[in-house]
Structures are given as structure tokens and as C-alpha cells.
């Protein structure tokens, strides 16, 4: 019996067909050597989107040819992806402390930028706004950061600067807007690099009012309280190179599993067990000089290759990484006696014994995953925000008899 992780079991044959055509990839034995038709491909795409927790295929806007250099948010998220992908042990510590227990990370690019730095009007400030409509409902925010790049200031020599961040709570027509303090960082005017401000406290408002974000406002002051134009302090905005533009990154603790829409499932035809009065021969332990075939050339329960190709699905216009991943599946015989290499449960051993006595009443034990791990997918949403999602129980790590 074949077992795939989670709801992927219905897609096994289709994915073999999709993944078998890539360079250097060999489909597992028994996979159909054909390409899917248009309708079948759409069905497979819809199923995988549901597994990934997406209601539909994202359609990001292609950037102009002149601005296709790497942008700051995707570069940062790609670093996070590699950190998360390196931590494939569900029980291990995360590769990066800032990831914490988050399994969903979203970045938001600066959509609107306002300045008050003209003439001698004070205080000076810079305001940023973001498209937060894609924030998922029902997710808990574990952290949120505003990242802005700073170059050395030639106007302030090496003075100490205080950079403060506020959330705009309510705009007023006849006075200053109502603000909520978020974070304060102290640095030197000659410093260079990414400045990170904690804006987690604003996340509750984002979750409640996705369509009414009034933005974040940044102030810079000297030690004596004099207001400084953020641009003169070396803080870059929308006019900066794409790799140095400001953005917000938010960490979520996602739901344990995506909510999948019900669909029609074709009933599987169950094969009738062959009647035999002969006891099966003992399975051989796989060793260096022999294969993993049991008696009569049948394979014992083990893990097989199953590659899911995002490239063959035509999704590389929105999936940043990876181009595909190995999901694997479990298949093979669980015949008595069950060797230690089969990772059999006590129940599987008992079921195998009863099957010997009553083969028509009790089926054999099943070959199924005994250990699953997560895989991470980095992609653009339809608003060109970059999303990093960790999907649990997507990769078979070990198989056994159940």
C-alpha cells in the first residue's frame, strides 16, 4: 500500500507525471510516463494551492524592465528562507532567533511616503504606509519589524541621534495627528547599515483595520532635542536603490493546518487479498550487497522518491524558492514476520499475526510515514508582498508498518 504525506496522497500519480520530466530526475517505478492534460493540470494546481493554504493562484505585477534589480524585501526574505530551510528538524531550535516559533512571515513594501522637511518647519518627520490587506485572518503576530537603511551622514559629523517610531492612530485637520509610540533606537550619525525598529505593538491595529492603515511616522532628534530631517540623518526612503528601500516584516504563528474546501473524491477500488494457505517467507534485512526486495521480488516497506515541481506547474512567476521539493512517499510489503528495519508498531505486528489466520477478515499492516518534516515556500502574493510560509508534515522522513 502506498502512503503519501497529508492530503498529497491523491496527487501521487499526477505529481510523478509532472516531476518526471525534469533534467536529472527519475520517476519512481510505476509512475505514468505521460504529461497531464489541461484539465488534470488545473485539478492538480488547485489541490496543491489548497495544501499551501492559498485560495487561488497569486498573480503579482511584473516590475518594469528598468527596476528588475533585486529589491530589499525579497533579499531579506530569501535569507530568512535559507535559515528556515536549514532547520528541517521539527523539534530542533530555529536557525535564526528572530524566527522564533513563527511559521508564516510576510513582508510589506512601502507604498506611500510623506515628508515634512521643507524650510524650517519642525518637527521634521518621514511617514510610511503599507498595503496590509493581505494579512491573513485568525493568525497571531509574534513580532513585527520596520527596516530602513542608513548611510553615513555628512551633515551631522559624528553626533548621537535618537530615532523614534510612532503609529499614526488618528489624523487631525487642525492639529498634529494622534500618535502611538512604538520604539526608540540610538545611533551615531556616521553609522551605516539596516536600522531595525520594533513595531509589534501596532500589529493588533493592523489585524483589526487592514483597510485603514494610517501609517508609521519616523522622527530623528539630536541629544539636545533638536529635530533633524531623516534624509539629512542618512535614512533612505523610496528614492533609495531597490536593495535599500524600507519595508516591514511581520512574523505570524499560523494555524496548525490550512482549511481545505470539500471536493468530490473518486472512490478507490480495493484489491481483494489473494487466498493462500502458505506462510510467507521471512523478509530479508536490506544490506550492502542485497536490494530491498522481500520474498518473491516484492519490496519491503520503505521510502520512495516523489518530486513536486513548481516549474512544471508553471508557477515560477510567483514562487521565488524552491523550484520544487522532494515530498517522498511510502510503499512496500508489511508481511509477517516484520523486521526491525520496517519500524513496525506493536499493533502492526498483532494485525499481521491475525491476518495470517484470517486473511479475508483482516488486511495486512500498511506501509505509512512514521516521521514527517516541514518544507518552506517563498513567494509573491498578488500585491507583490513577499511571503514565507512553513508548511508542516509535507516531507516523509521515514516509513514503517502500521
Swiss-Prot record:
Subunit note: Homodimer; disulfide-linked.
GO MF terms held by the record: cytokine activity; growth factor activity
Keyword Transcription regulation assigned: no
SS bonds (residue pairs): 301-367, 330-399, 334-401
Chief place of localization: secreted
Signal peptide segment: 1-19
GO biological process: cartilage development; cell differentiation; negative regulation of cell differentiation; ossification; skeletal system development
UniProtKB keywords: Chondrogenesis, Cytokine, Developmental protein, Differentiation, Disulfide bond, Glycoprotein, Growth factor, Osteogenesis, Secreted, Signal
Pfam families named among the record's database cross-references: TGF_beta (PF00019), TGFb_propeptide (PF00688)
Annotated localization: Secreted
Protein's name according to its UniProt entry: Bone morphogenetic protein 8B
UniProt record similarity statement: Belongs to the TGF-beta family.
Domain of life: Eukaryota
Cellular compartments per GO CC: extracellular space
Function: Induces cartilage and bone formation. May be the osteoinductive factor responsible for the phenomenon of epithelial osteogenesis. Plays a role in calcium regulation and bone homeostasis.
Sites where a glycan is attached: 158, 343
Propeptide: 20-263
Amino acid at each position: 500500500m502506498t502512503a503519501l504525506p497529508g492530503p498529497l496522497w491523491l496527487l501521487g500519480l499526477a505529481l510523478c507525471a509532472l516531476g518526471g520530466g525534469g533534467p536529472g530526475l527519475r520517476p519512481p517505478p510505476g509512475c505514468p510516463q505521460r504529461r497531464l492534460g489541461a484539465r488534470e493540470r488545473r485539478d492538480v494546481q488547485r489541490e496543491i494551492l489548497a495544501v499551501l493554504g492559498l485560495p487561488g493562484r497569486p498573480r503579482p505585477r511584473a516590475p518594469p524592465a528598468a527596476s528588475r534589480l533585486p529589491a530589499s524585501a525579497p533579499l531579506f526574505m530569501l535569507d530568512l528562507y535559507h535559515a528556515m530551510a536549514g532547520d528541517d528538524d521539527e523539534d530542533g531550535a530555529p536557525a535564526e532567533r528572530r524566527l522564533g516559533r513563527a511559521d508564516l512571515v510576510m513582508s510589506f513594501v512601502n507604498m506611500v511616503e510623506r515628508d515634512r522637511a521643507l524650510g524650517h518647519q519642525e518637527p521634521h518627520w518621514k511617514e510610511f504606509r503599507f498595503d496590509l490587506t493581505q494579512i491573513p485572518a485568525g493568525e497571531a503576530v509574534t513580532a513585527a519589524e520596520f527596516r530602513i537603511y542608513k548611510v553615513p551622514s555628512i551633515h551631522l559629523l559624528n553626533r548621537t541621534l535618537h530615532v523614534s517610531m510612532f503609529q499614526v492612530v488618528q489624523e487631525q485637520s487642525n492639529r498634529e495627528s494622534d500618535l502611538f509610540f512604538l520604539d526608540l533606537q540610538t545611533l551615531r550619525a556616521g553609522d551605516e547599515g539596516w536600522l531595525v525598529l520594533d513595531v509589534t505593538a501596532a500589529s493588533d491595529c493592523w489585524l483589526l483595520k487592514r483597510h485603514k492603515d494610517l501609517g508609521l511616522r519616523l522622527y530623528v532628534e539630536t541629544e539636545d532635542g533638536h529635530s533633524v530631517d531623516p534624509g539629512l540623518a542618512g535614512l533612505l526612503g523610496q528614492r533609495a536603490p531597490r536593495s535599500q528601500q524600507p519595508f516591514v516584516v511581520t512574523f505570524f504563528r499560523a494555524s496548525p493546518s490550512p482549511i481545505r474546501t470539500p471536493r468530490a473524491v473518486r472512490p478507490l477500488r480495493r484489491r481483494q487479498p489473494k487466498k493462500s494457505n502458505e506462510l510467507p517467507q521471512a523478509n530479508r534485512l536490506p544490506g550492502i550487497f542485497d536490494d530491498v526486495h522481500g520474498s518473491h521480488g516484492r519490496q519491503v516497506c520503505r521510502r520512495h522518491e516523489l518530486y513536486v515541481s513548481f516549474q512544471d506547474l508553471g508557477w515560477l512567476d510567483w514562487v521565488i524558492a524552491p523550484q520544487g521539493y522532494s515530498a517522498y512517499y511510502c510503499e512496500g510489503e508489511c508481511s509477517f514476520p516484520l523486521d526491525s528495519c520496517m519500524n513496525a508498531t506493536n499493533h502492526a505486528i498483532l494485525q499481521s499475526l491475525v491476518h495470517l489466520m484470517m486473511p479475508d477478515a483482516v488486511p495486512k499492516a500498511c506501509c505509512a510515514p512514521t516521521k514527517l518534516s516541514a518544507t518552506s515556500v517563498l513567494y509573491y502574493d498578488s500585491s507583490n508582498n513577499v511571503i514565507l510560509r512553513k508548511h508542516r508534515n509535507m516531507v516523509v522522513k521515514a516509513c514503517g508498518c502500521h
